[in-house]
Protein backbone atom coordinates (compact mmCIF):
# COMPACT_ATOMS: atom_id res chain seq x y z
CA UNK A 1 0.00 0.00 0.00
CA UNK A 2 1.04 3.60 -0.60
CA UNK A 3 1.05 6.61 1.63
CA UNK A 4 -0.14 9.70 -0.26
CA UNK A 5 0.03 12.41 2.33
CA UNK A 6 1.41 15.23 0.24
CA UNK A 7 -0.68 17.72 -1.65
CA UNK A 8 0.45 19.48 -4.79
CA UNK A 9 0.33 23.24 -5.10
CA UNK A 10 -1.06 24.76 -8.29
CA UNK A 11 2.49 25.65 -9.34
CA UNK A 12 3.66 22.06 -8.98
CA UNK A 13 0.64 20.79 -10.88
CA UNK A 14 1.53 23.15 -13.71
CA UNK A 15 5.13 21.93 -13.62
CA UNK A 16 3.95 18.33 -13.86
CA UNK A 17 2.02 19.34 -16.97
CA UNK A 18 5.19 20.86 -18.43
CA UNK A 19 7.16 17.68 -17.67
CA UNK A 20 4.49 15.64 -19.45
CA UNK A 21 4.63 18.02 -22.41
CA UNK A 22 8.39 17.57 -22.71
CA UNK A 23 8.46 13.78 -22.50
CA UNK A 24 5.48 13.26 -24.83
CA UNK A 25 6.98 15.62 -27.42
CA UNK A 26 9.93 13.23 -27.72
CA UNK A 27 7.59 10.56 -29.09
CA UNK A 28 6.48 12.75 -31.98
CA UNK A 29 9.71 14.50 -32.97
CA UNK A 30 10.55 11.81 -35.52
CA UNK A 31 7.31 12.21 -37.48
CA UNK A 32 8.20 15.64 -38.82
CA UNK A 33 11.80 14.80 -39.82
CA UNK A 34 11.43 11.39 -41.47
CA UNK A 35 12.34 12.85 -44.85
CA UNK A 36 15.55 14.30 -43.38
CA UNK A 37 16.42 10.98 -41.76
CA UNK A 38 15.77 9.17 -45.05
CA UNK A 39 18.14 11.58 -46.76
CA UNK A 40 20.91 10.56 -44.37
CA UNK A 41 20.27 6.85 -44.88
CA UNK A 42 19.24 6.49 -48.55
CA UNK A 43 19.81 2.73 -48.52
CA UNK A 44 17.66 2.10 -45.43
CA UNK A 45 14.25 3.38 -46.46
CA UNK A 46 12.56 0.34 -44.95
CA UNK A 47 14.08 0.91 -41.53
CA UNK A 48 13.36 4.65 -41.65
CA UNK A 49 9.69 4.02 -42.42
CA UNK A 50 9.42 1.85 -39.29
CA UNK A 51 10.56 4.57 -36.89
CA UNK A 52 7.15 6.14 -36.04
CA UNK A 53 5.44 2.75 -35.71
CA UNK A 54 8.21 1.26 -33.55
CA UNK A 55 8.07 4.32 -31.29
CA UNK A 56 4.35 3.74 -30.74
CA UNK A 57 4.95 0.01 -30.16
CA UNK A 58 7.50 0.95 -27.51
CA UNK A 59 4.92 3.22 -25.91
CA UNK A 60 2.37 0.39 -25.84
CA UNK A 61 4.92 -1.97 -24.27
CA UNK A 62 5.73 0.63 -21.63
CA UNK A 63 2.05 1.15 -20.86
CA UNK A 64 1.51 -2.53 -20.18
CA UNK A 65 4.77 -3.54 -18.53
CA UNK A 66 6.03 -0.40 -16.77
CA UNK A 67 3.02 1.65 -15.65
CA UNK A 68 1.67 -1.01 -13.21
CA UNK A 69 4.93 -0.81 -11.28
CA UNK A 70 3.90 2.61 -9.98
CA UNK A 71 1.53 0.88 -7.54
CA UNK A 72 4.45 -0.96 -5.94
CA UNK A 73 7.63 1.07 -6.47
CA UNK A 74 8.18 4.54 -5.00
CA UNK A 75 6.85 6.71 -7.80
CA UNK A 76 9.35 9.55 -7.62
CA UNK A 77 12.21 7.11 -8.11
CA UNK A 78 10.43 5.25 -10.91
CA UNK A 79 9.59 8.49 -12.73
CA UNK A 80 13.17 9.69 -12.35
CA UNK A 81 14.62 6.44 -13.72
CA UNK A 82 12.31 6.44 -16.72
CA UNK A 83 13.16 10.06 -17.47
CA UNK A 84 16.87 9.22 -17.30
CA UNK A 85 16.40 6.33 -19.74
CA UNK A 86 14.47 8.69 -22.02
CA UNK A 87 17.38 11.14 -21.94
CA UNK A 88 19.83 8.38 -22.90
CA UNK A 89 17.49 7.19 -25.66
CA UNK A 90 17.35 10.69 -27.17
CA UNK A 91 21.15 10.92 -27.06
CA UNK A 92 21.26 7.51 -28.76
CA UNK A 93 18.92 8.74 -31.49
CA UNK A 94 21.04 11.81 -32.08
CA UNK A 95 24.22 9.73 -32.41
CA UNK A 96 22.72 6.81 -34.37
CA UNK A 97 25.11 5.77 -37.16
CA UNK A 98 22.46 3.76 -39.04
CA UNK A 99 18.69 3.74 -39.40
CA UNK A 100 18.57 0.31 -37.75
CA UNK A 101 20.18 1.71 -34.61
CA UNK A 102 17.74 4.61 -34.80
CA UNK A 103 14.85 2.13 -34.82
CA UNK A 104 16.16 0.52 -31.63
CA UNK A 105 16.42 3.84 -29.82
CA UNK A 106 12.98 4.83 -31.13
CA UNK A 107 11.52 1.80 -29.37
CA UNK A 108 13.37 2.74 -26.19
CA UNK A 109 12.14 6.33 -26.49
CA UNK A 110 8.52 5.24 -26.77
CA UNK A 111 8.81 2.87 -23.83
CA UNK A 112 10.54 5.40 -21.56
CA UNK A 113 8.16 8.22 -22.54
CA UNK A 114 5.35 6.41 -20.73
CA UNK A 115 6.73 8.26 -17.73
CA UNK A 116 3.96 10.76 -18.55
CA UNK A 117 1.44 8.07 -17.66
CA UNK A 118 3.24 7.54 -14.36
CA UNK A 119 2.83 11.23 -13.60
CA UNK A 120 -0.93 11.46 -14.27
CA UNK A 121 -2.00 8.95 -11.56
CA UNK A 122 0.61 10.43 -9.23
CA UNK A 123 -0.99 13.86 -9.65
CA UNK A 124 -4.40 12.31 -8.98
CA UNK A 125 -3.07 10.70 -5.80
CA UNK A 126 -1.58 13.92 -4.49
CA UNK A 127 -4.53 16.18 -5.29
CA UNK A 128 -7.44 17.02 -3.03
CA UNK A 129 -10.48 14.87 -3.75
CA UNK A 130 -12.50 18.00 -4.51
CA UNK A 131 -9.95 19.12 -7.12
CA UNK A 132 -8.88 15.78 -8.60
CA UNK A 133 -10.57 16.35 -11.95
CA UNK A 134 -9.02 19.77 -12.42
CA UNK A 135 -5.59 18.40 -11.50
CA UNK A 136 -5.86 15.51 -13.96
CA UNK A 137 -7.13 17.90 -16.62
CA UNK A 138 -4.21 20.28 -16.14
CA UNK A 139 -1.61 17.51 -16.33
CA UNK A 140 -3.34 15.96 -19.35
CA UNK A 141 -3.20 19.37 -21.04
CA UNK A 142 0.56 18.93 -20.92
CA UNK A 143 0.26 15.55 -22.61
CA UNK A 144 -1.89 17.04 -25.38
CA UNK A 145 0.45 20.00 -25.78
CA UNK A 146 3.37 17.59 -26.12
CA UNK A 147 1.72 15.84 -29.05
CA UNK A 148 1.25 19.11 -30.91
CA UNK A 149 4.61 20.57 -29.88
CA UNK A 150 6.52 17.45 -30.90
CA UNK A 151 5.25 17.66 -34.45
CA UNK A 152 5.47 21.44 -34.84
CA UNK A 153 8.75 22.13 -33.03
CA UNK A 154 10.38 19.04 -34.50
CA UNK A 155 9.76 20.27 -38.01
CA UNK A 156 10.95 23.79 -37.21
CA UNK A 157 14.20 22.68 -35.56
CA UNK A 158 14.80 20.10 -38.28
CA UNK A 159 14.54 22.76 -40.97
CA UNK A 160 17.46 24.72 -39.52
CA UNK A 161 19.53 22.20 -37.56
CA UNK A 162 18.78 18.84 -39.14
CA UNK A 163 17.25 15.75 -37.59
CA UNK A 164 20.15 15.22 -35.19
CA UNK A 165 19.55 18.71 -33.86
CA UNK A 166 15.92 17.76 -33.21
CA UNK A 167 16.88 14.81 -31.03
CA UNK A 168 19.59 16.84 -29.29
CA UNK A 169 16.93 19.41 -28.43
CA UNK A 170 14.75 16.61 -27.09
CA UNK A 171 17.61 15.37 -24.90
CA UNK A 172 18.23 18.87 -23.52
CA UNK A 173 14.53 19.36 -22.73
CA UNK A 174 14.41 15.94 -21.07
CA UNK A 175 17.37 16.95 -18.93
CA UNK A 176 15.35 20.00 -17.89
CA UNK A 177 12.41 17.71 -17.06
CA UNK A 178 14.71 15.59 -14.86
CA UNK A 179 15.71 18.74 -12.98
CA UNK A 180 12.03 19.57 -12.40
CA UNK A 181 11.33 16.02 -11.23
CA UNK A 182 14.10 16.23 -8.65
CA UNK A 183 12.84 19.59 -7.43
CA UNK A 184 9.08 19.18 -7.23
CA UNK A 185 8.15 15.52 -6.70
CA UNK A 186 7.76 14.46 -3.06
CA UNK A 187 9.07 11.13 -1.85
CA UNK A 188 6.29 8.68 -1.03
CA UNK A 189 6.53 5.67 1.25
CA UNK A 190 5.24 2.19 0.49
CA UNK A 191 4.08 -0.18 3.22
CA UNK A 192 4.46 -3.22 0.93
CA UNK A 193 7.75 -2.72 -0.94
CA UNK A 194 8.10 -6.39 -1.98
CA UNK A 195 6.04 -7.67 -4.88
CA UNK A 196 5.89 -10.39 -7.53
CA UNK A 197 6.04 -8.87 -10.99
CA UNK A 198 4.03 -11.65 -12.64
CA UNK A 199 1.40 -11.28 -9.92
CA UNK A 200 1.25 -7.56 -10.71
CA UNK A 201 0.47 -8.32 -14.35
CA UNK A 202 -2.06 -11.00 -13.42
CA UNK A 203 -3.81 -8.50 -11.15
CA UNK A 204 -4.75 -6.47 -14.23
CA UNK A 205 -7.21 -9.19 -15.20
CA UNK A 206 -8.68 -9.26 -11.71
CA UNK A 207 -9.14 -5.50 -11.69
CA UNK A 208 -10.91 -5.68 -15.04
CA UNK A 209 -13.18 -8.42 -13.73
CA UNK A 210 -13.98 -6.85 -10.37
CA UNK A 211 -14.37 -3.18 -11.32
CA UNK A 212 -17.41 -2.63 -13.58
CA UNK A 213 -16.88 1.14 -13.59
CA UNK A 214 -13.43 0.59 -15.08
CA UNK A 215 -14.91 -1.56 -17.83
CA UNK A 216 -17.57 1.04 -18.53
CA UNK A 217 -15.15 3.96 -18.64
CA UNK A 218 -12.52 2.19 -20.75
CA UNK A 219 -14.93 0.70 -23.29
CA UNK A 220 -16.71 4.03 -23.66
CA UNK A 221 -13.39 5.78 -24.20
CA UNK A 222 -12.21 3.14 -26.68
CA UNK A 223 -15.32 3.55 -28.84
CA UNK A 224 -15.10 7.35 -28.79
CA UNK A 225 -11.37 7.26 -29.51
CA UNK A 226 -12.12 5.04 -32.51
CA UNK A 227 -14.64 7.64 -33.68
CA UNK A 228 -12.01 10.35 -33.22
CA UNK A 229 -9.37 8.32 -35.10
CA UNK A 230 -11.66 7.64 -38.06
CA UNK A 231 -11.75 11.35 -38.88
CA UNK A 232 -7.97 11.74 -38.98
CA UNK A 233 -7.61 8.57 -41.03
CA UNK A 234 -9.90 9.72 -43.83
CA UNK A 235 -9.39 13.51 -43.62
CA UNK A 236 -6.16 13.71 -45.71
CA UNK A 237 -7.79 11.68 -48.51
CA UNK A 238 -10.98 13.76 -48.39
CA UNK A 239 -9.04 17.02 -48.55
CA UNK A 240 -6.91 15.76 -51.44
CA UNK A 241 -9.88 14.35 -53.39
CA UNK A 242 -12.30 17.24 -52.92
CA UNK A 243 -10.02 20.29 -52.76
CA UNK A 244 -6.62 19.02 -53.94
CA UNK A 245 -5.13 20.09 -50.60
CA UNK A 246 -1.87 18.65 -49.32
CA UNK A 247 -0.38 17.75 -45.97
CA UNK A 248 0.03 21.42 -44.99
CA UNK A 249 -3.72 21.98 -44.75
CA UNK A 250 -4.15 18.72 -42.85
CA UNK A 251 -1.50 19.89 -40.40
CA UNK A 252 -3.21 23.25 -39.99
CA UNK A 253 -6.48 21.52 -39.17
CA UNK A 254 -4.66 19.25 -36.72
CA UNK A 255 -3.49 22.39 -34.92
CA UNK A 256 -7.12 22.91 -33.95
CA UNK A 257 -6.31 20.27 -31.34
CA UNK A 258 -5.25 23.22 -29.21
CA UNK A 259 -8.90 23.36 -28.18
CA UNK A 260 -8.31 20.13 -26.29
CA UNK A 261 -5.61 21.76 -24.21
CA UNK A 262 -8.09 24.43 -23.16
CA UNK A 263 -10.95 22.00 -22.59
CA UNK A 264 -9.11 19.49 -20.40
CA UNK A 265 -8.83 21.59 -17.19
CA UNK A 266 -12.36 22.93 -17.66
CA UNK A 267 -13.71 19.41 -18.07
CA UNK A 268 -11.86 18.37 -14.94
CA UNK A 269 -13.29 21.25 -12.91
CA UNK A 270 -16.80 20.47 -14.13
CA UNK A 271 -16.34 16.81 -13.17
CA UNK A 272 -15.27 17.88 -9.68
CA UNK A 273 -18.40 20.00 -9.24
CA UNK A 274 -21.09 18.06 -11.10
CA UNK A 275 -19.69 14.54 -11.29
CA UNK A 276 -17.94 12.83 -14.22
CA UNK A 277 -21.08 11.18 -15.64
CA UNK A 278 -22.60 14.50 -16.70
CA UNK A 279 -19.31 15.45 -18.34
CA UNK A 280 -19.29 12.17 -20.26
CA UNK A 281 -22.83 12.79 -21.49
CA UNK A 282 -21.92 16.35 -22.51
CA UNK A 283 -18.83 15.14 -24.37
CA UNK A 284 -20.75 12.43 -26.22
CA UNK A 285 -23.35 15.02 -27.28
CA UNK A 286 -20.58 17.25 -28.64
CA UNK A 287 -19.11 14.36 -30.64
CA UNK A 288 -22.52 13.40 -32.04
CA UNK A 289 -23.06 17.03 -32.99
CA UNK A 290 -19.64 17.05 -34.67
CA UNK A 291 -20.50 14.09 -36.89
CA UNK A 292 -23.83 15.73 -37.72
CA UNK A 293 -21.91 18.81 -38.85
CA UNK A 294 -19.58 16.67 -41.00
CA UNK A 295 -22.61 15.05 -42.60
CA UNK A 296 -24.72 18.15 -43.23
CA UNK A 297 -22.14 20.95 -43.63
CA UNK A 298 -19.90 19.64 -46.38
CA UNK A 299 -17.31 22.41 -46.59
CA UNK A 300 -14.00 23.52 -45.10
CA UNK A 301 -15.80 25.78 -42.62
CA UNK A 302 -18.00 22.87 -41.61
CA UNK A 303 -14.90 20.71 -41.23
CA UNK A 304 -13.31 23.28 -38.90
CA UNK A 305 -16.45 23.53 -36.77
CA UNK A 306 -16.80 19.76 -36.66
CA UNK A 307 -13.16 19.23 -35.68
CA UNK A 308 -13.48 21.74 -32.85
CA UNK A 309 -16.61 20.00 -31.55
CA UNK A 310 -15.14 16.51 -31.96
CA UNK A 311 -11.88 17.37 -30.22
CA UNK A 312 -13.61 19.20 -27.37
CA UNK A 313 -16.03 16.32 -26.87
CA UNK A 314 -13.31 13.67 -26.91
CA UNK A 315 -11.25 15.53 -24.32
CA UNK A 316 -14.27 16.11 -22.09
CA UNK A 317 -15.02 12.39 -22.02
CA UNK A 318 -11.35 11.46 -21.57
CA UNK A 319 -10.87 13.66 -18.50
CA UNK A 320 -14.20 12.61 -16.99
CA UNK A 321 -13.41 8.92 -17.43
CA UNK A 322 -9.97 9.38 -15.90
CA UNK A 323 -11.61 11.18 -12.99
CA UNK A 324 -13.81 8.10 -12.54
CA UNK A 325 -11.07 5.48 -12.58
CA UNK A 326 -8.71 7.45 -10.33
CA UNK A 327 -11.48 7.69 -7.73
CA UNK A 328 -11.96 3.93 -7.43
CA UNK A 329 -8.87 2.25 -6.01
CA UNK A 330 -6.14 4.49 -4.54
CA UNK A 331 -3.89 1.43 -4.19
CA UNK A 332 -4.27 0.51 -7.88
CA UNK A 333 -4.32 3.80 -9.79
CA UNK A 334 -1.39 2.91 -12.03
CA UNK A 335 -2.82 -0.48 -12.95
CA UNK A 336 -6.20 1.09 -13.64
CA UNK A 337 -4.43 3.62 -15.85
CA UNK A 338 -2.76 0.76 -17.72
CA UNK A 339 -6.11 -0.88 -18.40
CA UNK A 340 -7.69 2.42 -19.42
CA UNK A 341 -4.94 3.50 -21.81
CA UNK A 342 -4.32 0.09 -23.37
CA UNK A 343 -8.00 -0.55 -24.11
CA UNK A 344 -8.45 3.02 -25.36
CA UNK A 345 -5.61 2.70 -27.88
CA UNK A 346 -6.96 -0.67 -29.05
CA UNK A 347 -10.11 1.26 -29.94
Identify what each model region corresponds to:
Residues 105-143:
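Cytoplasmic helix-loop-helix junction between adjacent transmembrane helices
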Residues 115-127, 316-329:
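Intracellular juxtamembrane helix-capping segments at the cytosolic ends
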Amino acid sequence: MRSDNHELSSTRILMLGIICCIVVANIYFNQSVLNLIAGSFPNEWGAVSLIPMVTQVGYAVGLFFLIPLGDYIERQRLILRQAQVLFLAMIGMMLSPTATVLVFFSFLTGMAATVAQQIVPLAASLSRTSARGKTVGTVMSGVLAGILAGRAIGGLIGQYFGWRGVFLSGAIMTLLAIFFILRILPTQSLSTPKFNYLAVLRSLGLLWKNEPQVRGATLTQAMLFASFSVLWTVLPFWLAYRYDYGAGITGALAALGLIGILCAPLAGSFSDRQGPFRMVVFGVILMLLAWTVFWRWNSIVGMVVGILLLDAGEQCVLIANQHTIYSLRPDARNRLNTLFMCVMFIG
